[in-house]
């Protein structure tokens, strides 16, 4: 049985349709990422899954149950960690954990949870004295206290330093390793590639692509990217998309307004000399040139025309 089944989901506000008939499923034990620019509909979708919003149309099932029929049982089997969870600052870490334990018929011991999130030494510290990373780990511990089957994480590492981010990644992977299902939204492509078994890219209320990060990257038709920019006056040298797509081993070209460009290529050793020769023939000097492996970010920009962190 899938942990999550979504069929024909729609959500409208007055004349605006935020979610436009999306359908997807999430397997038990899977980390599933919802990616999309601001306003794409991903937050609305997640809030419907969490039982915060009611859909305008469509069906949502979690663990074979629906919010309309089984709200009390579902509340006991999901955990939710928001991007910024407000916790009482004048309570200690242990007091907050015991407060959240009181909400569930079954719960994990405080000492065990604090060990999992590496906060044992902060047990008696006030919440108001914790760092940003420590607060976020505490929020996830609160989400895990009721032994959930599904964990919802809304941009869990936004604003955290790299070390805190990786500590949270380890938490997610341990939860998945124990059989839990995770629904994740994030603005960090590295995070999605590291954690997610599958992702769905949402834009304008519709899922425009779904699959594993590796599958989506392969869908570009090439595994490498050449990024370059032309110097000042050379930026208007007349290099058009058709010129770049005609280069050997080039499968895609993205031109930016500032003269920068990214090419997806199957064989950099063939494409690079041809690109340099093209620029030289047009009298265009390269200000920057680099090659790298294609990433999920390249997939996202190709599909939406925007970077994930764009507003």
What are these model-derived regions, one by one?
Residues 59, 225, 285-288:
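Residues at or immediately flanking beta-strands
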Residues 170-266:
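ABC transporter nucleotide-binding domain
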Residues 2-6, 11-209:
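ABC transporter nucleotide-binding domains
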Residues 79, 101, 105, 218-222, ...:
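A generic structural signal for secondary-structure junctions
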Residues 268-311:
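C-terminal coupling/interaction segments
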Residues 67, 103, 233, 268, ...:
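Short beta->alpha junction loops/turns
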């Amino acid at each position: 049985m899938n942990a999550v089944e979504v069929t024909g989901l729609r959500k409208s506000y007055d004349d605006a349709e935020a979610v436009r008939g999306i359908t997807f499923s999430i397997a038990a034990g899977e980390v599933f990422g919802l990616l999309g620019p601001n306003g794409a509909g991903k937050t609305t979708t997640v809030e419907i899954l969490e039982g915060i919003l009611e859909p305008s149309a469509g069906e949502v099932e979690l663990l074979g149950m629906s919010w309309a029929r089984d709200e009390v049982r579902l509340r006991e089997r999901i955990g939710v960690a928001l991007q910024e969870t407000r916790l009482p600052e004048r309570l200690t870490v242990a007091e907050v954990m015991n407060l959240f334990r009181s909400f569930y018929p079954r719960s994990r011991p405080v000492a065990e949870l604090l060990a999992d999130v590496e906060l044992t030494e902060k047990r008696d510290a006030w919440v108001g004295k914790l760092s940003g990373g420590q607060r976020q780990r505490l929020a996830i511990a609160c989400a895990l206290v009721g032994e959930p089957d599904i964990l919802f994480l809304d941009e869990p590492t936004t604003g955290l330093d790299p070390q805190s981010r990786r500590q949270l990644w380890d938490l997610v992977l341990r939860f998945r390793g124990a059989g839990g299902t995770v629904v994740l939204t994030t603005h960090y492509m590295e995070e999605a590639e590291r954690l997610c078994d599958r992702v769905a890219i949402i834009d304008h209320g519709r899922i425009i692509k779904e699959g594993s990060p590796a599958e989506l990257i392969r869908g570009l038709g090439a595994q490498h990217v050449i990024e370059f920019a032309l110097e000042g006056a050379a930026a208007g040298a007349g290099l058009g998309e058709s010129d770049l797509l005609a280069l050997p081993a080039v499968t895609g070209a993205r031109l930016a307004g500032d003269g920068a460009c990214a090419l997806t290529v199957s064989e950099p050793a063939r494409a690079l000399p041809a690109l340099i020769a093209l620029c030289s023939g047009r009298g265009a000097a390269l200000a920057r040139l680099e090659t790298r492996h294609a990433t999920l970010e390249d997939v996202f920009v190709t599909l939406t025309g925007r970077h994930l962190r764009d507003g």
